[in-house]
C-alpha cells in the first residue's frame, strides 16, 4: 500500500486517538500527545461527517474536560489547528482553548 505523507499523518493521528480513547474508557487521564490526538481525530471525523467549520470549532471545545487529562495539559494546549476535509474541500480549523 502506497500512502502519501498526508495519509500517513492521518493514519498516525487515528492510531494515537484510538489508543487515547481506550485509555480514557479505562479511566486513565490523558497526557499531552493523547489529548491532542483525541481532539484532532474527532475534529477530522466531524468535518468528514459534513459539519460546518463553526460546528467543528465548537465541537472541539466539548470533547475533553480538565478531569479527563493529566495536570497541566490544558495549559499546554492553548489552541489546536487541524487541516480537515469537508464536503466542499480542505479547510484549516482552529479551536481555541480546547480543554476548558
Curated annotation (Swiss-Prot):
Q: Name one Pfam family in it.
A: Urease_gamma
The protein's predominant localisation is cytoplasm
Gene3D superfamilies (UniProt xref):
Urease, gamma-like subunit (3.30.280.10)
GO molecular function terms here?
nickel cation binding; urease activity
Asked if the keyword Transcription regulation belongs to this entry, the reply reads: no
Where does the source fall among the domains of life? Answer: Bacteria
Alphabetical UniProt keywords:
Cytoplasm, Hydrolase
**SUPFAM superfamilies named in the record:** Urease, gamma-subunit
Q: Which reaction does it catalyse?
A: urea + 2 H2O + H(+) = hydrogencarbonate + 2 NH4(+)
Its annotated pathway? Nitrogen metabolism; urea degradation; CO(2) and NH(3) from urea (urease route): step 1/1
Q: Where in the cell is it found?
A: Cytoplasm
Top enzyme class, one word, equals: hydrolase
One GO BP: urea catabolic process
- EC number(s) from the headed UniProt entry: 3.5.1.5
Instruction: List the GO terms this entry assigns under cellular component, sorted alphabetically.
Output: cytoplasm
Its quaternary organisation is: Heterotrimer of UreA (gamma), UreB (beta) and UreC (alpha) subunits. Three heterotrimers associate to form the active enzyme.
The record's similarity note reads: Belongs to the urease gamma subunit family.
PANTHER family per the UniProt record, alphabetical: UREASE
Output this protein's name.
Urease subunit gamma
What organism does the UniProt record list as the source? Paraburkholderia xenovorans (strain LB400)
Gene expressing this chain: ureA
